[in-house]
Amino acid sequence: YGAIDGECYLRGIVGERFAVRNSGATAVVEGVGDHGCEYMTGGIVVVLGKTGLNFAAGMSGGIAYVLDEDGTFKNRCNLAMVELEPVPEEDDLLESEHHHGGDLEHHGRVDISSDMTRYDEERLRNIISRHLKFTRSDVAKKILDDWDNFRPKFSISIRYLNFSKTSVSMS
């Protein structure tokens, strides 16, 4: 409740109201009960499994990545203040924005924390890798070992509806 910083990697499923009022922490879980990410204002949450009902209710900031293997997450997510979108493949994103598809090696690594409106695939994969490192999670290993198959299933990225507009207007 109300974490402002730090990282949390939990191997297994958590109960109701996980990451409520999260305002800056990064957290990974393998499933969550009802009301996950409720009133979240910042930070990043990764859910590597099913969610309960009313996910993201009142969420006004941050990003949540949810593995949606069966395509039913939209029925359990409260869409009043958030939108769902696919996690773009990095090569597609680089090509569409910078015409540098397949060129990450040439340009070096990017700071994935400096711009929360881009770098979703790299950020997500990095966070799942840390989850595997700290928890030895079989779920994380399975996902990373078959990334090309799982990335599209992760295809749900949640951002507060005005997150990108606000970020652009403040710069």
Spans of features found by a protein language model:
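Long, distal/terminal scaffolding or interaction modules
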Residues: 1-171
